[in-house]
From Swiss-Prot:
GO terms for cellular component: endoplasmic reticulum; endoplasmic reticulum membrane; mitochondrion. Its EC number is 2.3.1.199. Induction: Repressed by herbicides such as flufenacet and benfuresate. Up-regulated by osmotic stress and abscisic acid and down-regulated by darkness. Down-regulated by low temperature and up-regulated by salt and drought. The lineage of its organism: Eukaryota, Viridiplantae, Streptophyta, Embryophyta, Tracheophyta. One of its GO terms (biological process) is fatty acid biosynthetic process. Residues 81-370 form the FAE domain. It is found in: Endoplasmic reticulum membrane. PANTHER family: 3-KETOACYL-COA SYNTHASE (PTHR31561). Belongs to the thiolase-like superfamily. Chalcone/stilbene synthases family. This is 3-ketoacyl-CoA synthase 6. The gene is CUT1. It catalyses: a very-long-chain acyl-CoA + malonyl-CoA + H(+) = a very-long-chain 3-oxoacyl-CoA + CO2 + CoA. In epidermal cells of aerial tissues and in the tapetum of anthers near maturity. Expressed in siliques, flowers and leaves. It comes from the Eukaryota. The keyword Acetylation does not apply. It comes from Arabidopsis thaliana.
Amino acid sequence: MPQAPMPEFSSSVKLKYVKLGYQYLVNHFLSFLLIPIMAIVAVELLRMGPEEILNVWNSLQFDLVQVLCSSFFVIFISTVYFMSKPRTIYLVDYSCYKPPVTCRVPFATFMEHSRLILKDKPKSVEFQMRILERSGLGEETCLPPAIHYIPPTPTMDAARSEAQMVIFEAMDDLFKKTGLKPKDVDILIVNCSLFSPTPSLSAMVINKYKLRSNIKSFNLSGMGCSAGLISVDLARDLLQVHPNSNAIIVSTEIITPNYYQGNERAMLLPNCLFRMGAAAIHMSNRRSDRWRAKYKLSHLVRTHRGADDKSFYCVYEQEDKEGHVGINLSKDLMAIAGEALKANITTIGPLVLPASEQLLFLTSLIGRKIFNPKWKPYIPDFKLAFEHFCIHAGGRAVIDELQKNLQLSGEHVEASRMTLHRFGNTSSSSLWYELSYIESKGRMRRGDRVWQIAFGSGFKCNSAVWKCNRTIKTPKDGPWSDCIDRYPVFIPEVVKL
């Protein structure tokens, strides 16, 4: 199914998104204003010396009213500053689920199952083969046990078993890494788009680990592949108002109940791309975690295009003519993703780009709007703002188009391509497999900036910016531990099956 290419980033940027980005800066204007003033005063006091300061003090004449007014003013300004200053949000550590080898689905196995399940639909089998050949996936991606049966057995029990397997293993590893005890978890957020049982997945986690009765728990569903960053945004907001707290985020997609067994081509695409995976993330606002945390959250920008009908329906769960439920992916998906991306990065640009890049971009944008629409648009160099890029591994076409539009090198998108090859599209958890890849390659240094970009149904585009808090040693375990030496690998345009 041919898809419209993603439009060039700066061909139709709207000024309202630029304005939105600068509104973020204005909201923190007081902090930006007071910090240099305080620094100048401190430097001047250090320059004067104690005797000169004492002489100045003695030369001043104060009365009680002046002292009270001055004290009140200082206290008022200090209070306003510290109340308006947001808490620092840390990413202490995270863990990614590593599927067992028994769940692997080589191309030959996938196609054999497709031929048996769709034995009366040879054209649908051929279509899946063409998609798989060009998907960018490798031979080691995994599907849950229920999908290995012929025919598949997508029962509620099987779906719960998959959820328990991926979520509990990721959380067990996270607790082991961080030393965090279940009783110390204050906030729990679980996001899974297509599987929403009763009791919820968050309740399942609470029951398993016997978490506190006053825990603040949330279960997000139906929010697509970008739900992981929505969970980060929710955790950030909660940590801003609840001091000295620990938050756990679980991002996953349960494949078992969502494996499409019908014949509609647009609904067969997810079968070829989506694979099992999960990630558990520990976030905190405790000052005691500042020394051991891996990252600090700098910015998070969310863009929702749901008001537009095409955007709303481009990723849509529905029944086909035979009653089989599946996800319909529109041929306009790439174009819609491009529009969401433009809005998102135009908003985040003023927050992260150097002043020189902002000036060039704004000059180009205003010139095109006022003087000549045919002027060649200036594409900001986001490589000056970030050292690492984690682009949602939704498919080969998504990565190709973002690399082209953002003018990124092969190394910048390496983590995304290799994650797609090794694990497939693991939905909302893919960003964390990509971050783990960068760490496993030993590339993460203190001060490095990471840009995570995710797309999701609705249609949404979300961005998170992290700053590395300390140089990260190459991990000895994790999802890449047994294969990182083989990567990066060459991925041909077409793999003949």
